[in-house]
Design a protein with these regions (language model features):
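N-terminal leader/targeting and accessory segments in enzymes
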Residues: 1-103, 107, 305
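Short internal beta-strands
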Residues: 37-44, 234-237, 381-382, 402-411
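Short beta-strand "acidic-cap" motif of Rossmann-like dinucleotide-binding folds
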Residues: 37-42, 144-145, 181, 267, ...
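Nucleotide phosphate-binding/pyrophosphate-handling subdomain across enzymes
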Residues: 4-14, 26-34, 297-403, 418
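Residue-level detector of alpha-helix initiation sites
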Residues: 22, 85, 123-127, 310, ...
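Beta-strand->loop->alpha-helix junctions that form or flank phosphate-binding loops
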Residues: 42, 64-66, 103-107, 146, ...
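Phosphate-binding loop of NTP-binding sites
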Residues: 13, 30-32, 69-73, 82-237, ...
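C-terminal helical cap/extension that packs against the catalytic core
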Residues: 50-59, 392-447
Length: 480
């Protein structure tokens, strides 16, 4: 192993992996299994996956503590982890000089041995990914799911193949997945010029990661890459940005950029659907999930609360329809799917007040959806690292959706307080535990208290899961 102070000027293989977290390690593992040589660089002196890397590739050269320019000057291919911006000067210069700059998703797309179904969006990605995976499993399909959620995509290719006697041709043959169902972030899509997915969806677009992107258009452009080479485009007809993406795809020269390539479009939304689209219909006083004129199931039979989860369910149904999953299996999954932790998760009812953990609400759009989706009077706990976001949409949602108290924590609490001035009672606390205690004292029977921060967690917590766990523990401590 080489360090910054022990530099070998012969860069083996001319492939550089940038970043040695979970994704970088999966890239190293995949290349090592294929017998390809590479070097690894990381800005940290002790990256988290270093020890495991050295068990996979004991002789690999590592350059730690910075991004050494000479490493990139000799690179033909640079595999960038999602947490590293391609705008880093050494990476941008290498790309200008002809190096191929990709991420793990491009490698995955090249080597995937089954159709890819891909999900992105500012909010709802993990819910739709796991919901669709459950639909496929209830249909009896062997699928692999991962990506931004859970297992890195290259590790999906490296997993031991599973013998499934009821699906294999002769009862002994290892069975490939019927589909890879993958959640993708904008960071992953930045380096994915052409995914060639069988089906893909952009669930929604709202401002996020504005500390990484110059503006919303740059963020949106990264998301749009998911449709390149896609056979079935699933689109949210309620989202103007997504529909603009669709028009761009329809206007693209398919032979050059591969945006639809003889494919089709399926739309979903919360309005009444036409033809083969998915949406909501009212019948005999009840609201139904519907495909065209066909009512599929009452919306209130879903386990997940919130109007935003109806949109998630409709997106999953549209993707499942493209995959030709049986309708009964898809609806069964919707009736039983419990949701994921930290996503509008019911915690407890104490003295008539319902407490919800939506710690995964790390951007303004997610919190707006949580507020709109939760009926009745509400107390909102929010705040953290706003990542340069505009909080104005939060102000409008609070005015329109019966939020009578906002309790703020974290780095950008003063910024949010200024945005909400004059529209709602706002209190600031120094800790999440103090926010819970204050919410308990100021809430009334019939209220819902929602932790939905509209911010990242890293100013006060390890991650959004840590933040959610602290909230849940604080709420449970209120129990008599």
């Amino acid at each position: 192993m080489a360090s910054r102070t022990m530099i070998d000027t012969d860069i083996a293989g001319n492939t550089v992996i940038v970043g040695l977290g979970k994704t970088g390690l999966s890239c190293a593992r995949f290349l090592a299994q294929r017998g390809e040589s590479f070097v690894v660089v990381d800005t940290r002196q002790s990256p988290p996956a270093l020890a495991e890397l050295l068990t996979i590739a004991p002789d690999v050269d590592c350059y730690l503590g910075g991004l050494e320019p000479f490493v990139f000057e000799q690179a033909d291919r640079i595999i960038v982890s999602p947490g590293i911006s391609v705008k880093e000067s050494v990476i941008a210069k290498a790309r200008f000089n002809g190096a191929e700059v990709i991420g793990d998703i491009m490698l995955f797309a090249h080597y995937a041995d089954a159709p890819i179904v891909a999900i992105t969006g500012s909010n709802g990605k993990s819910t739709v990914t796991t919901m669709l995976a459950e639909m496929a499993r209830q249909a009896g399909l062997y699928i692999e799911a991962g990506g931004n959620l859970g297992t890195p995509v290259l590790d999906l290719l490296s997993l031991p193949q599973v013998t499934k006697p009821d699906m294999a041709v002769d009862g002994n043959k290892p069975e490939k997945p019927a589909y890879y169902i993958v959640e993708l972030s904008s960071f992953q899509l930045e380096t994915t010029a052409r995914l060639n997915a069988f089906a893909a969806v952009v669930l929604n677009i709202s401002a996020d990661h504005m500390d990484r992107y110059n503006d919303l258009q740059e963020y949106r452009a990264a998301k749009r890459n998911i449709y390149n080479g896609c056979e079935v485009l699933v689109v949210n007809r309620d989202d103007p940005d997504v529909m603009e993406m669709l028009q761009e795809c329809l206007a693209t020269d398919f032979d050059v950029n591969g945006s639809i390539k003889n494919g089709s479009v399926i739309s979903f939304g919360l309005s009444q659907p036409e033809d083969d689209a998915f949406g909501l219909r009212n019948s005999n006083g009840r609201q139904y999930l519907a495909k065209g004129e066909q009512c599929l199931m009452p919306a209130d039979e879903m386990r997940l609360p919130g109007r935003h989860n109806l949109a998630n369910a409709l997106a999953a149904l549209a993707l499942g329809d493209a995959m030709q999953l049986p309708l009964d299996a898809m609806l069964s999954a919707l009736r039983t799917y419990p949701g994921l932790p930290h996503r509008t998760q019911w915690v407890a009812t104490i003295n008539g007040v319902n407490w919800y953990n939506d710690s995964k609400g790390t951007n303004v759009g997610a919190t707006v959806s949580a507020i709109i989706g939760m009926p009745g009077p509400k107390v909102l706990i929010a705040g953290g690292d706003g990542k340069g976001a505009d909080f104005a949409p939060l102000r409008e949602a609070i005015i329109a959706n019966n939020v009578h108290l906002v309790i703020l924590i974290g780095k950008d609490a003063p910024v949010i307080k200024e945005t909400l001035f004059g529209v709602v009672q706002v209190e600031l606390t120094r800790s999440l535990e103090a926010a819970v205690t204050l919410a308990y004292s100021l809430s009334s029977d019939g209220d819902s208290v929602i932790l939905s921060p509209a911010c990242a967690s890293f100013d006060m917590f390890n991650d959004y899961e840590h933040r959610g766990d602290v909230f849940v523990n604080a709420v449970m401590s209120l129990q008599p």
